Regions:
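Histidine-centered catalytic micro-motifs
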Residues: 39-49, 82-91, 143-149
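Conserved beta-strand hairpin/beta-sheet module of binuclear metal-dependent hydrolase folds
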Residues: 1-27, 32, 93-105
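Metallo-beta-lactamase
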Residues: 16-17, 88-162
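Hydrophobic "anchor" residues on beta-strands that sit immediately upstream
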Residues: 9-11, 39, 63, 78, ...
């Protein structure tokens, strides 16, 4: 969940498998007094979309899935979509240049990359996507769909796939 000072919230991926996870998520939104305004999906694998219906129905949102590359029209946030196929053909990253943040889903992880052995995966395509992603400023904070945050600079130095 990404928030601004006015407590508007963008939800990135809705990987809530079970009801207790959904309840915990809803409690967090309520406790922090957040107002969800968008649900962004990085790619349509179950671990990123299984809570999509819950989020859509609970907060009256329509998920943004596989948007066109370019600027997203979402109030309060400057979000740029970067197409990043390879792990899955519909994969995208969400870059927030004003905050220097990148949400990568399963495209880029700390010192690793997304799998390409699943349907829709292709290593050559993923490598091309990664070459575009690492062109972002070195101090860009990277938030992958799994694991720990990292930076573009760290990945350029230590990721064996780059």
């Amino acid at each position: 969940v990404l928030t601004d000072d006015a407590k508007h919230a963008i939800i990135i991926d809705a990987g809530m498998y079970e009801e207790h996870e959904q309840q915990r998520f809803a409690a967090y939104i309520q406790q922090e007094q957040l107002t969800p305004i968008a649900l962004l999906i990085t790619h349509a694998h179950p671990d990123h979309v299984c809570g999509q219906t819950f989020v859509e129905q609970t907060y009256n949102l329509d998920a943004i899935i596989q948007p066109d590359e370019g600027q997203l029209d979402i109030p309060y946030f400057n979000i740029h979509v970067i197409a990043s196929p390879g792990h899955k053909e519909d994969a995208v990253c969400y870059h927030l240049p004003d905050e220097n943040i990148l949400f990568t889903g399963d495209t880029l992880f700390q010192e690793s990359i997304g799998r390409t052995d699943l349907p829709g995966g292709d290593m050559d395509t993923l490598i091309r996507s990664l070459k575009r992603v690492i062109m972002l400023p070195n101090n860009t904070q990277v938030y992958p769909g799994h694991g720990y945050p990292t930076t573009i600079e760290h990945e350029k130095q230590y990721n064996p796939y780059l």
